[in-house]
Structure formats: C-alpha cells, structure tokens
Amino acid sequence: MLFLQFLFVDVVLGGSITENVVQENISLYLMQISSYANQSWTQNLGSAWLDQLQTHSWDSESGTIIFLHAWSRGNFSNEEVTDMQLLLRVHFAELTLDVHQQASQLQFKYPFDIQVRLGCELHSRETTKSFLHVAFNGLNFLSFQHKSCVPSPEGETRAQKACDILNTYEATKEIAYYVMNDICPRLLLSLLEAGKMDLQRQVRPEVWLSSSPNLEPGRLLLACHVSGFYPKPIWVMWMRGAQEQLETKQGDILPHADGTWYLRVTLNVVAEEAAGLSCRVRHSSLRDQDIILYWGHGLSVILIALAVIVPLVLLIVLVLLCKKRCTYQGIP
C-alpha cells in the first residue's frame, strides 16, 4: 500500500532544528481520514496537531496545505511548501487507486474509512517517543513498531493480511521509521521555536457563578462559568470543602474569536444543600493560586454591605435633620 507515503510527505517540510528550544512533554501528531464510499468516490482529509492545537489542515479541493497560524510554516521556505503540496496531490491520487485495488483482497466492504495517526512526543531534547496507528472504521487495525507492521487483535485476519503486504514493502517501512524517529521530532522543535510566543501565552480566566431553576421541584442547577483562558487545558470542579462533587458535569470547551476558551461546569443540587458549595478552577496561568468562588458568597457580601451602608445613610439623614431643626429654631 502507498498510504504511508502520505505520512512521509506531510512532515517532510524541511528546516533545521533550533538549538535553543527547550520543551518537555508535548506531542506533534498527524491525522489522515480517508473515506471510501464506493469504487468511484473517495475523500481524503489531513491535519496536523501540536497537542490540542491544530496547526495545519489539508484542502482536498485545491490540493493545498492550510497554515492555521502565522508560525505554522516553521522555518520552511515557499519552495519547500510548494514541493510538498505537489507531492501530496500525487500521493492522494496513488493512495486512492492502491486502496481500491487491495480492497477485495483485504475484504474491505464499501463504504469504509481508514484513519491514520502518526506522531512523536518530546520528553527532552534527547528523548522522544514515536507512534503510528492505523484504524479501520474507527477500530484499531494495525500499528508500526520499529520497522515492522503489527496487526491489532481487533483487526482480525484482515489486519494480518494488510501487515503481510506492508511488511514486504521495505521502502514504505523505511519511510515510516524515518518520519517517526527523525522528521517528526525535528518538525516538532521547529514549530515550538517558530510559535513560542503564541504557545507560551498565558491568559487568566474570568470566573462567575449562576443558577437556574431545575425541572425537579426544590432543586437548583448551579453553573460555574470560566471564560477567556489560554491555553486550553483546564480543571474545574464543584467542591464541598475539600471534597470533589462527583456529580459535576462539564460541557464542551468552546473557542472565543480571540483564541481564548470558555467552559461551563454544572451541578444539580437540592436547593437547601447549595450553601457551602464552591467552584474551584486550576489553570497554568494561575500557577498554584487556584480560583475558588463560594456559592452564596456574593449574596453575603451584599447583605453585609447593606447592613453597614443603610445605618450610615440613616445616621447622615438624622444629622442633617437635626441641623436643619436647630437652624429653624434660631430664627426669631
């Protein structure tokens, strides 16, 4: 099969390693999703991700790479990008033909999808962990270990047949190994250097609480809103003292137009038991200073403020009235 050549072309972007990059526990992975509806219709999607941040996508209509950030090119020249896009177009054409030809032998029944995930994780400048996994219709199908194709138990006999074929393709295995253990780590470091200002950006979240009546009588749906934070990873939990409330439900992390994120976390509680609950937020921008908001705390502050301000206003009014009365009494 030729589909592994996609992985080679997608990461051979050129460029050198920047020596002053130091980044740990971050991964770069490439995704390919190829959908085969029948013998005459195929769609290929491609993307690249730096941890949870998408850096590239593939426009199958125009046959071009979409760079999603100003730094997504790394240190690659326009000529290198042009050459890579041409190679990708050729690859997808050959990939489609090759898979269709092998479909009968591998017992692939239309329609079907093939997903490929290749990447590397950087632990230090000297240590990386690489991987290449292939799925068929969303189930583990095969993987590459060192320079060999290894079938997944879920892939059954079809995966074994595919590996039997791939293991005879010495050039394909060499390409896969080279991409995982050489090109991927170098590309990862290049992106980290080119995008370090954006990747190292830290924006503190804003947090507020709200509630709404529940469909069940006597219950409240408490909501903890966390907005405007960056980067994306965050931990939010409703708490009672030091105890996490396991019924906490987290919604999807949604993007803002400025690149920051929003999250809503809810808890369904009996109204009388809402007192004493708090929402705790942990984020890299906060360092070790978690944000903790207590339910009902805002109301308590208002009551305290009213308890202080109202008597003060009454005292001022009383003083003014006394002065006014004294003034009238002094008039003959």
From Swiss-Prot:
Domain Ig-like: 205-292
Signal peptide: 1-17
More about this protein: During protein synthesis and maturation, CD1 family members bind endogenous lipids that are replaced by lipid or glycolipid antigens when the proteins are internalized and pass through endosomes or lysosomes, before trafficking back to the cell surface.
Function summary: Antigen-presenting protein that binds self and non-self lipid and glycolipid antigens and presents them to T-cell receptors on natural killer T-cells.
Primary localisation category: membrane
Sequence ranges on the Extracellular membrane side: 18-300
Membrane-traversing stretches: 301-321
Organism: Cavia porcellus
Subunit structure: Heterodimer with B2M (beta-2-microglobulin).
Cystine pairs: 120-184, 224-279
Source superkingdom: Eukaryota
Biological processes annotated in GO: adaptive immune response; antigen processing and presentation, endogenous lipid antigen via MHC class Ib; antigen processing and presentation, exogenous lipid antigen via MHC class Ib; positive regulation of T cell mediated cytotoxicity
GO MF term set: endogenous lipid antigen binding; exogenous lipid antigen binding; lipopeptide binding
Membrane topology, as annotated: Single-pass type I membrane protein
Alphabetical list of SUPFAM superfamilies matching this protein: Immunoglobulin (SSF48726), MHC antigen-recognition domain (SSF54452)
Pfam family, one: C1-set
A GO-annotated cellular component: external side of plasma membrane
Identification of the protein by name: T-cell surface glycoprotein CD1c2
Organismal lineage: Eukaryota, Metazoa, Chordata, Craniata, Vertebrata
Residues exposed to the Cytoplasmic side: 322-332
Glycosylation sites: 25, 38, 75
